[in-house]
């Protein structure tokens, strides 16, 4: 990657050439998960022997849809403030003027935004951080975070800058100001993302997702598309319209996986503990004209209690849990993984498990239990964050049939 800050800025920690990075990630993943892929010593019927890890590469530049920058007055000079990132290998910040891993529209806005921040003291006074969020359709949210209260004078100036940026870049820009316990939204805090799956094939379909400031969303839309295609293709080979059944999703968020999978299942019972994420999921359902997703505000343990009828939840009073015929479960846990044996043993009740992991080490631990009842049907390695050592994995597991 051609970046003047490569090896200096700590945003990118892997400075090898991209093909070497990807091969190293593949080799390490293969080494760690070999026992789950090599079936020679297993007493189960498997489709292939051994199973290959499917590797999905990212664009090397211009792939990241969000960024978090800091500012420090230490870097003030005659040309003004710069964005700042943590230094590579050191506990201090370094100034940067550009970031090639960002989507092109975010790269374009960085120098323009810096110009305005350096021009107006009202904008840069006690400015602490800046978050950027974009869609592939070039709509942008700029969040400016301050150690001061923001008044009507700030709002008037920020609105003026917002309009000038929109005119210059010919796209929708939304500036948000944040200070302690306050959020100033000048126009909107939600943008639209259109993702097309299986482009230029008979299966091509486009979905619309709302992305909200401060809410989690997939940072690499190119890899996200490949992740969705991977899961949809795997499940489409298992489930057909002639075999209608339902899916349970734990940690569904705002529906990144839920929305595209709705066409495969009769119903999806989508559970999530964050109330605002469920609200966004409902917006995504309406936008995509989907009616067979049933959201519920439950954590993983509450979901298990509800489905086992161990506890009655008032918030589920209008949902008939007995009407579901679950065959598949999708779980996208935090970096800490599932961990809890009670949840893992509960997952073993489903014929199909889709496990989305952002931490191979916790995935490895969880598979030690899940592999007692299921085999790995497909294993995908997704390079969500090029130029880092991060690895994203998706494992499709099917219930095993012992050979008698």
UniProtKB/Swiss-Prot annotation:
GO BP terms in the entry: methylation; tRNA processing
First-level EC class: transferase
UniProt-recorded Gene Ontology molecular function terms: rRNA binding; tRNA (uracil(54)-C5)-methyltransferase activity, S-adenosyl methionine-dependent; tRNA binding
Catalytic activity line of the entry: uridine(54) in tRNA + S-adenosyl-L-methionine = 5-methyluridine(54) in tRNA + S-adenosyl-L-homocysteine + H(+); uridine(341) in tmRNA + S-adenosyl-L-methionine = 5-methyluridine(341) in tmRNA + S-adenosyl-L-homocysteine + H(+)
CDD domains noted in UniProt: AdoMet_MTases
Keyword S-adenosyl-L-methionine tagged: yes
UniProt entry keywords in alphabetical sequence: Methyltransferase, S-adenosyl-L-methionine, Transferase, tRNA processing
Annotated InterPro entries: MeTrfase_TrmA_AS, SAM-dependent_MTases_sf, TrmA_MeTrfase, U5_MeTrfase_fam
One protein family per Pfam: tRNA_U5-meth_tr
Active site: 358, 392
Any GO CC annotation of this UniProt entry: cytosol
Domain of life, per lineage: Bacteria
General function of this protein: Dual-specificity methyltransferase that catalyzes the formation of 5-methyluridine at position 54 (m5U54) in all tRNAs, and that of position 341 (m5U341) in tmRNA (transfer-mRNA).
PANTHER family, sorted: TRNA/TMRNA (URACIL-C(5))-METHYLTRANSFERASE, TRNA_TMRNA (URACIL-C(5))-METHYLTRANSFERASE
Protein name stated in the entry: tRNA/tmRNA (uracil-C(5))-methyltransferase
């Amino acid at each position: 990657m051609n970046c003047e800050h490569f090896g200096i800025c700590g945003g990118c920690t892997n400075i090898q050439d991209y093909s070497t990075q990807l091969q190293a990630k593949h080799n390490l993943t293969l080494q760690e998960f070999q026992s789950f892929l090599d079936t020679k010593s297993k007493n189960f019927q498997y489709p292939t022997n051994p199973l290959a890890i499917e590797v999905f590469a990212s664009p090397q530049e211009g792939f990241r849809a969000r960024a978090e920058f800091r500012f420090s007055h230490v870097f003030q000079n005659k040309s003004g403030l710069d964005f700042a990132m943590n230094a590579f290998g050191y506990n201090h910040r370094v100034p940067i003027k550009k970031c090639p891993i960002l989507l092109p529209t975010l790269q374009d806005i960085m120098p323009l935004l810096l110009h305005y921040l350096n021009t107006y003291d009202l904008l840069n006074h006690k400015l602490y951080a800046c978050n950027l969020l974009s869609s592939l359709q070039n709509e942008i949210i700029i969040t400016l975070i301050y150690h001061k209260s923001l008044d009507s004078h700030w709002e008037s100036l920020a609105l003026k800058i917002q309009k000038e940026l929109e005119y210059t870049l010919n796209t929708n820009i939304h500036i948000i100001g944040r200070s302690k316990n306050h959020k100033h939204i000048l126009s909107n805090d939600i943008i639209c993302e259109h993702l097309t799956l299986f482009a230029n094939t008979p299966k091509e379909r486009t979905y619309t997702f709302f992305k909200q400031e401060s809410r989690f969303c997939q940072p690499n839309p190119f890899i996200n598309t490949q992740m969705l295609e991977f899961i949809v293709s795997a499940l489409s080979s298992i489930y057909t319209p002639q075999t209608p059944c339902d899916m349970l999703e734990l940690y569904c968020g705002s529906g990144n996986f839920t929305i595209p999978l709705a066409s495969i299942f009769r119903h999806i019972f989508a559970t999530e503990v964050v109330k605002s994420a469920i609200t966004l999921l409902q917006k995504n359902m309406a936008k995509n004209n989907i009616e067979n997703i049933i959201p519920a505000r439950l954590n993983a343990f509450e979901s298990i209690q509800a489905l086992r009828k161990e506890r009655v939840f008032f918030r589920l009073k209008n949902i008939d849990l007995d009407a579901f015929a679950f065959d598949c479960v999708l779980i996208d846990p935090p970096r800490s993984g599932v961990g809890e044996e009670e949840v893992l043993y509960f997952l073993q009740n489903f014929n199909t498990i889709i496990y989305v992991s952002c931490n191979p080490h916790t995935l490895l631990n969880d598979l030690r239990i899940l592999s007692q009842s299921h085999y790995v049907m497909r294993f995908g390695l997704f390079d969500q964050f090029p130029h880092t050592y991060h690895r994203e994995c998706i494992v499709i597991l099917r219930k095993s049939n012992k050979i008698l």
